[in-house]
Amino acid sequence: LVAHHRDRVKITAVVVVSCSTGGKVPGIAQRVAKKSGLPTDVLAFDVNAACSGFVYGLISGLSLCQPGGAVIVCAAEAMSRLIDKTDRNTGCLFGDGVGAVLLEDRPAFREYNWHAGCDGDRVDLMRGEIGGGITLGGMQVYDRAVKTMSDTLNRLHDNGIKPAVVVGHQANSRILQKIREQVDAGDAVFVDSVEQFGNTSAASIPLALGTCVADRSIPATGRMSLVAYGAGEAWGGVSVDYDLTDAIALHGS
């Protein structure tokens, strides 16, 4: 991604999102910046907000965008480190993956908007740690995921700007379908890549976008709404203009 855009824009920041690093120091972002050949004046930092991490990374990255510059937001997850493979309830749900996007402030782009938050009183609904497995609060998580993401999208669309594409955290196809039924998004394409990748936590949204780029299943330009809900009951959504005419399907799992 850096090589593809190096001659066109100056990359000023790198945001790497992950909940599966094990808390290593230094962070991944500094290593990504070095291996990508970026200059030493680039801002680089990690974000951990579990399944909402990519949306949080986007909010951070968009706030750092300046005319003539660009920000890379990358999500990398190795959920195989966290799952208990003997647990039939969760072991089969999660996958590993990585995806990245490049953000720019272009004159033609309308102002983005976002809405996010968390409820620390509900931290026990979803938990995970390396070697300790993942625990989920069953139907309570399902119900709250549907309500929270639906409410967030409807709030994002209150300004009257309807998206061409909606990409939710790819945790469960039934959740995505329920959100689709409850959100006023006009004729927007609702992306679902759960069957292909499973739940890749923070990497699920960029992986889904990479699939759309590869199969050209969404318009090349327009407005996009992205939304997520996850552990710590962290949640968030972003509505932003996009341009995929020069995009490359650089993703993996």
Regions found by a protein language model. Give the residues of each.
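Short beta-strand segments
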Residues: 17, 48, 72-77, 103, ...
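Active-site pocket-shaping loop/turn-to-helix segments
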Residues: 20, 45-52, 90-92, 130-151, ...
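Claisen-condensing/thiolase-fold acyl-transfer catalytic domains that form or cleave C-C bonds
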Residues: 20-21, 39-41, 47-68, 164-253
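Acidic-glycine-rich active-site phosphate/pyrophosphate-binding loop
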Residues: 24-38, 70-79, 124, 175-186
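Condensing-enzyme catalytic core mediating Claisen C-C bond formation in acyl metabolism
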Residues: 85-147, 154, 229, 241-253
